[in-house]
């Protein structure tokens, strides 16, 4: 098999994006457009991947920061042909070069493999699509007798008859390296744009007797580029719809497939149910029977079987055990591990803590930097006071502890097995096991006490 070189053109300005951010760094499904393209390129196992950048300067390579890539600036930007010229020192004399675009994020690996398979030492492969309205795109001109590709004519240089052609060039092509060097050197810029068009090498291929083969993607949107926020939003919906359909085909129950956002990888077991307006970021795994309530955000989370995440919960970088109950309005922060049958209720925040099986914090509490044993009850309003303004400290709550409401645990502190903490206590020292511990001021009732009376407002 011929060595594969990939060149990604990512130097465009993106004027219609109306943004200081380089176009290829705008996010789709939570990651930059260019990263989508590079992930696809990586799946093809190329010998080299060269990225041509320009507008935005070093912002693009600094943001991506991938040492396996070859970054080459294009200054000034004089067209697609000129862009590929910049990569020539990094392209071998033999093999195939696949040309991709940093603002065309959804081309599938399968489509590109099909295109690459068509290309060879004597064949140039083009990815084309038929559009009902081809305005603005380069047209594929074929010989009237043989049907073979003769040339690609850009919109601004096309005749009236050529503009009626519905087959358009997507820009994605696989070119034999043995010809690429020579063809690029012959490019001229005597066109309406004054640019060096990469598409002109197609006519050169025909002239040199190199076959020009065409392939089509499974879906037209695989070759759709982004030039505006409108197009970006449209591709976002296309991507999310495709992801939702995959989940449905796997047996996941979605309350509304149009109202789910996947910004990473979502893996689901059997009988998983997802309500509306949920967002999944990073690597999320939902095991069998998990139910996710509406308006929930999960990021880099594993949720074990039969657990329920109630609406409006936020969980990130955490591990949730079997048959847990989370929320509504719960926040679980990074470093948290909940074992089986743990309950975290409304307006409870847990950070960098481990809760053993059967423990509960059902209302209005903060558990930070804590280790909580089995079958512990955390009363409403309990706070682990873990920060002294400079350092964080750990709270340890052993098995079978009952913590009364409105308790402050001043870390570092240990609550021993079987302890009961009276409501309203501030615990500053370790507690003994199997005893009631409380710290309160003595309750007083003052006879004859009068409430303050508001002073009358002065008259104007």
From Swiss-Prot:
GO CC field: cytoplasm; membrane
Pathway: Nucleotide-sugar biosynthesis; UDP-N-acetyl-alpha-D-glucosamine biosynthesis; N-acetyl-alpha-D-glucosamine 1-phosphate from alpha-D-glucosamine 6-phosphate (route II): step 2/2; Nucleotide-sugar biosynthesis; UDP-N-acetyl-alpha-D-glucosamine biosynthesis; UDP-N-acetyl-alpha-D-glucosamine from N-acetyl-alpha-D-glucosamine 1-phosphate: step 1/1; Bacterial outer membrane biogenesis; LPS lipid A biosynthesis
E.C. number(s) listed in UniProt: 2.7.7.23, 2.3.1.157
PANTHER family the record matches: BIFUNCTIONAL PROTEIN GLMU, NUCLEOTIDYL TRANSFERASE
Cofactor, how bound (note): Binds 1 Mg(2+) ion per subunit.
Catalysed conversion reaction: alpha-D-glucosamine 1-phosphate + acetyl-CoA = N-acetyl-alpha-D-glucosamine 1-phosphate + CoA + H(+); N-acetyl-alpha-D-glucosamine 1-phosphate + UTP + H(+) = UDP-N-acetyl-alpha-D-glucosamine + diphosphate
Active site location: 363 (proton acceptor)
Name of one Pfam family that matches: NTP_transf_3
Region (Pyrophosphorylase): 1-229
Any single biological process term in GO: lipid A biosynthetic process
Keywords from the named record: Acyltransferase, Cell shape, Cell wall biogenesis/degradation, Cytoplasm, Magnesium, Metal-binding, Multifunctional enzyme, Nucleotidyltransferase, Peptidoglycan synthesis, Repeat, Transferase
Chain residue ranges for the region called Linker: 230-250
Gene Ontology molecular functions: glucosamine-1-phosphate N-acetyltransferase activity; magnesium ion binding; UDP-N-acetylglucosamine diphosphorylase activity
Description of how the protein assembles with itself and partners: Homotrimer.
CDD domains reported in the protein's UniProt record: GT2_GlmU_N_bac, LbH_GlmU_C
Residue numbers spanned by region N-acetyltransferase: 251-460
Family label: In the N-terminal section; belongs to the N-acetylglucosamine-1-phosphate uridyltransferase family.
Species this protein is from: Nitrosospira multiformis (strain ATCC 25196 / NCIMB 11849 / C 71)
Predominant subcellular localization, coarse grouping: cytoplasm
Protein name: Bifunctional protein GlmU
Cross-referenced Gene3D superfamilies: Hexapeptide repeat proteins (2.160.10.10), Spore Coat Polysaccharide Biosynthesis Protein SpsA, Chain A (3.90.550.10)
Protein location: Cytoplasm
Amino acids binding UDP-N-acetyl-alpha-D-glucosamine: 9-12, 23, 74, 79-80, 101-103, 138, 154, 169, 227, 333, 351, 366, 377
InterPro entries: Bifunctional_GlmU (IPR005882), GlmU-like (IPR050065), GlmU_C_LbH (IPR038009), Hexapep (IPR001451), MobA-like_NTP_Trfase (IPR025877), Nucleotide-diphossugar_trans (IPR029044), Trimer_LpxA-like_sf (IPR011004)
Function noted in UniProt: Catalyzes the last two sequential reactions in the de novo biosynthetic pathway for UDP-N-acetylglucosamine (UDP-GlcNAc). The C-terminal domain catalyzes the transfer of acetyl group from acetyl coenzyme A to glucosamine-1-phosphate (GlcN-1-P) to produce N-acetylglucosamine-1-phosphate (GlcNAc-1-P), which is converted into UDP-GlcNAc by the transfer of uridine 5-monophosphate (from uridine 5-triphosphate), a reaction catalyzed by the N-terminal domain.
